[in-house]
Design a protein with these regions (language model features):
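N-terminal signal peptide c-region/cleavage motif recognized by signal peptidases
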Residues: 18-20
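Bacterial N-terminal signal peptides that target proteins for export
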Residues: 1-10
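Repetitive helical segments and hydrophobic/amphipathic motifs
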Residues: 13-16
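Short loop/turn and low-complexity linker motifs enriched in small/turn-promoting residues
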Residues: 23-55, 64-182
């Protein structure tokens, strides 16, 4: 009898965990993309590199991603990276909804280089439903300064008035400053 109850308990716990895993709310990061910012934060704790999913609460969010991966060219392997990141604005993420996108996945270095310059995507949720622009949209954050290794995407978005970062306070990381009293 105890063995039967134990089996039932383990089965029930497994079912509960699998339902919770399927009922996530967030953003699924496609292959060849890396997370740069989530709601203005770099390296968010809510991102699982294992499942490639950023766990989010329902509501408005912004995800900044860069295209970067290794691609084979004969016997060599080379890194191909986009100069400009994708900025995805999710206007109203619903509970139990996971947003992602589809794109023509490059199979080799030449295809990856071509894709990195244009980055055309189709936003959808994980059920395959294409999202209208009223629910989610994207743009490519271009720079008038050309290629730069250490771009500050948060500052660039803030200067354009397009940053969504509810926990970020602009200019808060400047250190100590003087007031009129010294």
């Amino acid at each position: 009898m105890l063995s039967k109850n134990l089996k039932f308990s383990v089965l029930a716990a497994g079912l509960l965990f699998s339902v919770n895993a399927m009922a996530d709310t967030g953003f699924k990061v496609p292959v060849h993309y890396n997370v740069e910012l989530v709601d203005g934060e770099s390296d968010p704790d809510s991102y699982s590199r294992f499942s490639r999913t950023v766990t989010l609460t329902p509501g408005k969010h912004q995800v900044v991603l860069t295209f970067k991966d290794n691609f084979k060219n004969g016997s060599d392997s080379r890194i191909v990276q986009s100069i400009d990141p994708l900025v995805i604005d999710i206007n109203n993420l619903k509970a139990d909804q996971v947003v992602t996108f589809q794109y023509a996945k490059p199979a080799n270095e030449d295809q990856a280089k071509r894709y990195a310059h244009q980055q055309k995507i189709t936003l959808s949720d994980t059920t395959g439903r294409v999202l209208p622009s009223s629910e989610a949209s994207y743009f490519i954050l271009t720079s008038d300064k050309g290629f730069s290794l250490m771009r500050d995407y948060r500052q660039e978005l803030d200067s354009l008035g397009r940053l969504y970062a509810p926990a970020y306070v602009s200019n808060a990381d400047k250190g100590l400053t003087m007031t009129e009293y010294g």
